[in-house]
Amino acid sequence: MSKPIRVRYAPSPTGLLHIGNARTALFNYLYARRHGGTFIIRIEDTDRKRHVEDGERSQLENLKWLGMDWDESPETHENYRQSERLALYQQYIDQLLAEGKAYKSYVTEEELAAERERQEAAGETPRYINEFIGMSADEKAKYISEREAAGVVPTVRLAVNESGIYKWTDMVKGDIEFEGGNIGGDWVIQKKDGYPTYNFAVVVDDHDMQISHVIRGDDHIANTPKQLMVYEALGWEAPEFGHMTLIINSETGKKLSKRDTNTLQFIEDYRKKGYMPEAVFNFIALLGWNPGGEEEIFSREQLIALFDENRLSKSPAAFDQKKMDWMSNEYLKHADFETVYALCKPFLEEAGRLTEKAEKLVELYKPQLKSADEIIPLTDLFFSDFPELTEAEKEVMAGETVSTVLQAFKAKLEAMSDEDFKPENIFPQIKAVQKETGIKGKNLFMPIRIAVSGEMHGPELPNTIYLLGRDKSIEHIKNML
């Protein structure tokens, strides 16, 4: 009988939730929900130097915003933060020390640096050389006594089986193996400050929490043999491992970097700009996985039902900001008005644009929005000075029939009563200009649009003219004549 599926997302509270970490959480979430398993949140906070105040809350809030829920976490269970589990780590470190599978190392940072420098100068691969090699028992005891008297605080190192082969069948990449002699020698499992290192603590945690599958980024592949060594030393069965391919920038073809200013890489950024969480969830789910077929828009429930770990990509996932924005626009276009207005309202309020026309403006520009904050630049026409025309727009307005069109349309607007000035009555006036002048198509619509709005493209022209108002529309046209 197969053991229950239990997966975890284990962030460090060292900053905002990055798109790559969000994908790790999301794939674990989808895997658990697809197979009726348990999704666990564990906080890995042993790196005290990089700890960020409020980092844990930020991580959890952004996961919730994306639409993920979990079954176990520090919110519901005790000792789900590594800093609360130090006694447990110490128990297993003491066990390994007692069994001779680990030992205290008194080598200093200066000595390690000097040895590394010597190895590099000699063209050797840097590795730790056991400081006790060649020592008799008496020499070893004397060495330890002298080091302790000098105030040297030891680390604890795992004794590596240099001839061991550490292999696993990866859920994504297939068979992978490492030789024990190629991982850099005996490595530290407990630092001088008493905190365990990541590769030791994560094994104790995963075993204690009965994690069945570890799904993470392929930057962790080099950690896996070290973790398998700990499982072996403690006599525990290792979980299954799956390493997702890295995420690359679609424009540069290089690994996604936090310095890539053309991409929004933190979930907080999407929240602040007014993206729909469902759109971001959908987009991230397709970074390195797809269900097959041409369809790209899926609800959370559909993604859970379709998720198949066998379709995780072996090739890097391309992060395309334009694709994200296209998908976001699809969600906003098809969302109900109340949802989109609620997203736009804070931006309108902050800009002092929460007027009686606010709802109509959101309705007008809803089909164009990629994020709710775009409602401000899109509505500048209604609250700011007329924009400076581009060279392309100036070229259109220099056309020989432009004056004829604008004169005729201005006359139509001036002749409309207040009662008749409605969107449904404005379009017939444009068609009347066409009939009277014989000018049609772009030569008719483009000059009117540019004269009224200062733009070649935009939402439905009659609605724009209506919301701008008859007087202001006429004023803009006069200024173009």
Curated annotation (Swiss-Prot):
Keywords, comma-separated and alphabetical: Aminoacyl-tRNA synthetase, ATP-binding, Cytoplasm, Ligase, Nucleotide-binding, Protein biosynthesis
UniProt GO BP: glutamyl-tRNA aminoacylation
Catalysed reaction equations from the record: tRNA(Glu) + L-glutamate + ATP = L-glutamyl-tRNA(Glu) + AMP + diphosphate
Gene Ontology cellular component list: cytosol
Signal peptide (residue range): none
MF terms (GO), sorted A to Z: ATP binding; glutamate-tRNA ligase activity; tRNA binding; zinc ion binding
Domain of life: Bacteria
Annotated Gene3D superfamilies: 1.10.10.350, HUPs
Transmembrane spans: none
Pfam families linked to this entry: Anticodon_2, tRNA-synt_1c
Function: Catalyzes the attachment of glutamate to tRNA(Glu) in a two-step reaction: glutamate is first activated by ATP to form Glu-AMP and then transferred to the acceptor end of tRNA(Glu).
Family statement: Belongs to the class-I aminoacyl-tRNA synthetase family. Glutamate--tRNA ligase type 1 subfamily.
HAMAP family per UniProt: Glu_tRNA_synth_type1
Listed name of the protein: Glutamate--tRNA ligase
Organism: Streptococcus pyogenes serotype M4 (strain MGAS10750)
Taxonomic lineage: Bacteria, Bacillati, Bacillota, Bacilli, Lactobacillales
This protein's encoding gene: gltX
